[in-house]
């Protein structure tokens, strides 16, 4: 049995959960999220607490039920508080700008790279070098942040590139040269 799956998901009165045949819909002050459910997972709600239980004891089902509990918990946190990822641009001349809802990055290429913000994601820029991605879906916020970082990941010699705020980049020594 999954240790995470056994834990209940507690939510406030601001959050409403509705279970259809194959879906769970979580509504809160920041928005609404939906998740398709497996037939092998049983979900019960009792006084603002959600319980996830496996229907059978098959190994695949036991692996899934902890994952479902974690995803539903992330949905509850997302519709109440939301999620945020911060990226920083390091390098001479590296800067970010907003053009409407799109993000334009100047990161050493001959042209600016433009990223369109999908629905449900807000992108903000601080001091031209910090990009803030926020939204209610933890998965989508993380995926967009990862896509932006992959445009110019930090290189190991000088550390130039796009990185998460607080990310440690291991640096290499340059070549020794002639003596």
From Swiss-Prot:
SUPFAM superfamilies in alphabetical order: Ribosomal protein L6 (SSF56053)
Q: Does the keyword Oxidoreductase apply?
A: no
Q: Which GO terms describe its cellular component?
A: chloroplast; cytosolic large ribosomal subunit
One GO term in the molecular function aspect is: rRNA binding
Gene Ontology biological process terms in this record: cytoplasmic translation
Using the UniProt record, give the first listed, main subcellular location. Answer: plastid
Oligomer status and interactors: Part of the 50S ribosomal subunit.
What is the annotated localization of this protein? Plastid, Chloroplast
Q: Record's NCBIfam families?
A: L6_bact
Give the organism, scientific name.
Guillardia theta (Cryptophyte)
Give the protein family.
Belongs to the universal ribosomal protein uL6 family.
Keywords linked to the UniProt accession: Chloroplast, Plastid, Ribonucleoprotein, Ribosomal protein, RNA-binding, rRNA-binding
Is the RNA-binding keyword given for this protein?
Answer: yes
What job does the chain carry out?
Binds 23S rRNA.
Q: Which Pfam families match?
A: Ribosomal_L6 (PF00347)
Its domain of life reads Eukaryota
This chain belongs to the protein called Large ribosomal subunit protein uL6c
